[in-house]
Amino acid sequence: MRIGVLTGGGDCPGLNAVIRAVVRTCHARYGSSVVGFQNGFRGLLENRRVQLHNDDRNDRLLAKGGTMLGTARVHPDKLRAGLPQIMQTLDDNGIDVLIPIGGEGTLTAASWLSEENVPVVGVPKTIDNDIDCTDVTFGHDTALTVATEAIDRLHSTAESHERVMLVEVMGRHAGWIALNAGLASGAHMTLIPEQPFDIEEVCRLVKGRFQRGDSHFICVVAEGAKPAPGTIMLREGGLDEFGHERFTGVAAQLAVEVEKRINKDVRVTVLGHIQRGGTPTAYDRVLATRFGVNAADAAHAGEYGQMVTLRGQDIGRVPLADAVRKLKLVPQSRYDDAAAFFG
C-alpha cells in the first residue's frame, strides 16, 4: 500500500510528530511506503511531493516545530475546480489512501474529498482546540504553555509598575487558549468570544482590585473577543479571501476604552505567532504520535472517511462529516468556573 500525507492550514507544534508516526507505522507495521505532498492541498494540485523514509531524518522530526512538508491554505473553490488534477496526482503517484493533517478548513476539504470517493483519514490539529468530536487537539498544549509562561512574566512587571496589562492570545472564534491560560496563570479576568464583554464590568473589576490595595491587574483577551451589544463599538477588519474574519487587535482597542474610564496605566501585549512556533511540549508530542499511529492503522484497515480523535485516554475515530459540522466552543459551565477567579 502507498500512503499520501499532507499538512494544511496554519502551522502547529506537533505536525512533524504526526508525520514521523505515520511513516514509522506504515514502514514497520505494514511494509507500506509514504509520500508527502508539499504545501498542503497545493501540493496535490501541482503534483509536488517527496518520498518519506523511515530513517534518522524521520526520527529527528519528533521535537521539531512547524512542518517539514510546508503548509498553505487553498480556497475551497480552487480545490473543487481542481478535483480532476487531484485525482490525477493521486493516480500518478499510486496513492491508495490520503492522510490530511489540519484544522477546520483542511478537515472540511478532506470530508468533501471523501464524498468524492477519495480514500481519506483525517488527523485534527490546531492550537485553537476548536475541532469537534475530540477532547483536545495537539498544538493546544504547547500554545497554552507559551501563553501561560508569558503571563507569568507579565505579573511581575505589572506589579512593579502598578499597571493594568491586557494580554491578547490566539484562538479565533474559540476561547480555549484564553480561558485555560487565564486559569493557569492566575489572571484577574479573561475575555473570550463565546461571552461578549461589558466594558463597564471590566472597569469595575479593575477599580475594585486597586481599591482593595492590590498592585496590578492582568486581563487575558482572546483575539476574537467582542463587546456586548449596546456597549462600545470596536473596529472591524472584514473578511479575508477565504471568508475568515480579520481580527483587528481587540486588546489595543480595549486598552483605549479602559484608560478613558480609569486613572491607570494600561499596557498591551500581543503574543501572536509565538504561540504557534517552536518545540512541541511532551504532551503534544505524545498525542501527535498516537494520532499518527492510529491514522496509519485506519488507512490499512480500510476505515476511510474517518478522523482520529481523543476521548478520555483512548484514541478512536469518528466520521469526518460529524467532526466538521460545528466548532467546539467554550461552554457556559467552563466560563462560569473561570469567572469565580475574576477580580
Curated annotation (Swiss-Prot):
Its EC number is 2.7.1.11, 2.7.1.144. Pathway: Carbohydrate degradation; glycolysis; D-glyceraldehyde 3-phosphate and glycerone phosphate from D-glucose: step 3/4. InterPro entries: ATP_PFK, ATP_PFK_prok-type, Phosphofructokinase_CS, Phosphofructokinase_dom, Phosphofructokinase_III, PKF_sf. Mg(2+) binds at residue 104. GO terms for molecular function: 6-phosphofructokinase activity; ATP binding; diphosphate-fructose-6-phosphate 1-phosphotransferase activity; fructose-6-phosphate binding; metal ion binding; tagatose-6-phosphate kinase activity. Substrate binds at residues 126-128, 163, 170-172, 223, 267, 273-276. One of its GO terms (cellular component) is 6-phosphofructokinase complex. It is found in: Cytoplasm. It catalyses: beta-D-fructose 6-phosphate + ATP = beta-D-fructose 1,6-bisphosphate + ADP + H(+); D-tagatofuranose 6-phosphate + ATP = D-tagatofuranose 1,6-bisphosphate + ADP + H(+). ATP binds at residues 10, 73-74, 103-106. It is an enzyme of class 2 (transferase). Inhibited by high concentrations of the substrates fructose 6-phosphate and ATP, and by the reaction products, fructose 1,6-bisphosphate and ADP. Allosterically inhibited by phosphoenolpyruvate (PEP), guanosine diphosphate (GDP) and citrate. The record marks 105 as: Important for substrate specificity. The keyword Magnesium applies. GO terms for biological process: canonical glycolysis; fructose 1,6-bisphosphate metabolic process; fructose 6-phosphate metabolic process. Its main location: cytoplasm. Its cofactor is Mg(2+). It comes from the Bacteria. Keywords: Allosteric enzyme, ATP-binding, Cytoplasm, Glycolysis, Kinase, Magnesium, Metal-binding, Nucleotide-binding, Transferase. Homodimer or homotetramer. NCBIfam families: PFK_mixed, PRK03202.1. Activity of PfkA is tenfold higher than that of PfkB. Activity with tagatose-6-phosphate suggests that PfkA and/or PfkB may substitute for tagatose-6-phosphate kinase and further support glycolysis. Catalyzes the phosphorylation of D-fructose 6-phosphate to fructose 1,6-bisphosphate by ATP, the first committing step of glycolysis. Can also catalyze the phosphorylation of tagatose-6-phosphate. Both sugar phosphates can function equivalently as substrates. Cannot catalyze the reverse gluconeogenic reaction. HAMAP family: Phosphofructokinase_III. Belongs to the phosphofructokinase type A (PFKA) family. Mixed-substrate PFK group III subfamily. This is ATP-dependent 6-phosphofructokinase. It comes from Mycobacterium tuberculosis (strain ATCC 25618 / H37Rv). The gene is pfkA.
